Swiss-Prot record:
Belongs to the radical SAM superfamily. Biotin synthase family. Catalyzes the conversion of dethiobiotin (DTB) to biotin by the insertion of a sulfur atom into dethiobiotin via a radical-based mechanism. Keywords: 2Fe-2S, 4Fe-4S, Biotin biosynthesis, Iron, Iron-sulfur, Metal-binding, S-adenosyl-L-methionine, Transferase. Homodimer. This is Biotin synthase. InterPro entries: Aldolase_TIM, BATS_dom, Biotin_synth/BioAB, Biotin_synthase, Elp3/MiaA/NifB-like_rSAM, rSAM. One of its GO terms (molecular function) is iron ion binding. It comes from Flavobacterium psychrophilum (strain ATCC 49511 / DSM 21280 / CIP 103535 / JIP02/86). It is an enzyme of class 2 (transferase). Binds 1 [4Fe-4S] cluster. The cluster is coordinated with 3 cysteines and an exchangeable S-adenosyl-L-methionine. Binds 1 [2Fe-2S] cluster. The cluster is coordinated with 3 cysteines and 1 arginine.
Length: 362
């Protein structure tokens, strides 16, 4: 029987990651079966409710306003548009809808009120609702919880050390603080990262240390393979090899046994065989739909064919945590405080991010 731990060291995690592959897979698959049904995989749909125009400089992201990419910015979707997309996702087999907005942080006002109504609407469809909206305060987290939010996503992206090579417009500590604010409510935490950004194996282990030492550990950990987008500072990074993804999934499963490990961005470059190995290694959640915010993703019908081929079943909603109750806006205990929190603005610069900022296409 595996033991839940919150004191993993970087050295221990590197040693696990570098095990002979057959030993690594056997250990990960054995632990996976202790805590989860190996033939059940959660299907989530990621919906970009507000695209582009983000003031941040995340080196991997085509939604940053400072980079010249082919992304077309869109204003916040309406509640009815979101409801229609959620119903479509539900009919395709998704049990969770994750709404993403390209914001640095949530600001109190009409747009946030609209997002809260989206959360209420989707929760009433008996689907898990997740949001990724940037940094949030404790009061904003409580307002989301009252609306019926099931999960809040805020990825650490990478290790604290390598983070400074990826993003200069906010600090790693802001990520941790946002997760802490979510933990003051009944909302579950979704937090993971990206591999393939030029980081070392030590950095991958460092990210897993940061995640696994959170108490409690995140209920969901997305593992993304970088999708290099033209116009971003990471446009020339080489694609992640499937073996790296398998090792990362397996290592995550071993050190966080109860967590749902989500096979996220980068699946377009993975064969069915590669994805099957990831499921065997402990991945038990995917994002479905033709796009992940702005990057291509396998068609949901193709995913369902893969599920049938592998004998996998989509997970039903609220399997891990019971459905939250929706409190209507008029009955809410928490109101807008008009907060203007002082999130950090690190003073360092990242040369390749600066080079791409404001540079037009030839």
């Amino acid at each position: 029987m595996s033991v839940m731990r919150n004191n993993w060291t970087k050295e221990e995690i590197i040693a696990i990651y570098n095990k002979p592959l057959m030993d690594l897979l056997y250990e990960a698959a054995s632990i996976h079966r202790e805590y989860h049904d190996p033939n059940v995989v959660q299907v989530s749909t990621l919906l970009s409710i507000k695209t582009g125009g983000c003031p941040e400089d995340c080196g991997y992201c085509p939604q940053a306003a400072r980079y010249h990419t082919d992304i077309e910015g869109n204003d916040l979707m309406s509640v009815q548009q979101v409801k229609a997309q959620a119903l479509r996702a539900k009919s395709s087999g998704s049990s969770r809808v994750c709404m993403g907005a390209a914001w640095r942080n949530v600001k109190d006002g009409p747009e946030f009120d609209q997002v809260l109504e989206m959360v209420r609407t989707i929760n009433k469809l008996d689907m898990e609702v997740c949001c990724t909206l940037g940094m949030i305060t404790e009061n904003q987290a409580h307002r989301l919880a009252e609306a019926g939010l099931y999960a809040y996503n805020h990825n650490l992206d990478t290790s604290e050390e390598y983070y400074k090579e990826v993003i200069s417009t906010r600090g790693f500590e802001d990520r941790i603080e946002t997760i802490a604010n979510v933990r003051k409510t009944n909302v579950t935490v979704c937090s993971g990262g990206i591999i393939g950004m030029g980081e070392s194996i030590g950095d991958r282990a460092g990210m897993l240390v940061a995640l696994s030492t959170l108490s409690p550990q995140p209920e969901s950990v997305p593992i993304n393979a970088l999708v290099a987008v033209e116009g971003t500072p990471m446009e020339e990074e080489k694609p992640v090899e499937i073996w790296e993804m398998i090792r990362m999934v397996a290592t995550t499963r071993i050190i966080m046994p109860e967590t749902q490990v989500r096979l996220s961005a980068g699946r377009m470059n993975m064969t069915r065989e590669g994805q099957a190995m990831c499921f065997f290694a402990g991945a038990n959640s995917i994002f479905a739909g033709d796009k992940l915010l702005t990057t291509p993703n396998p068609d949901v019908n193709e995913d369902m064919k893969m599920f049938e081929m592998l004998g996998l079943n989509p997970q039903k909603p609220f399997t891990k945590v019971s459905q939250p109750t929706t409190v209507e806006a008029k009955d809410s205990r928490y109101e807008s405080l008009g907060e203007k929190p002082k999130w950090s603005r690190p003073s360092h610069t990242i040369e390749k991010n600066l080079e791409l900022s404001g540079k037009g296409k030839n």
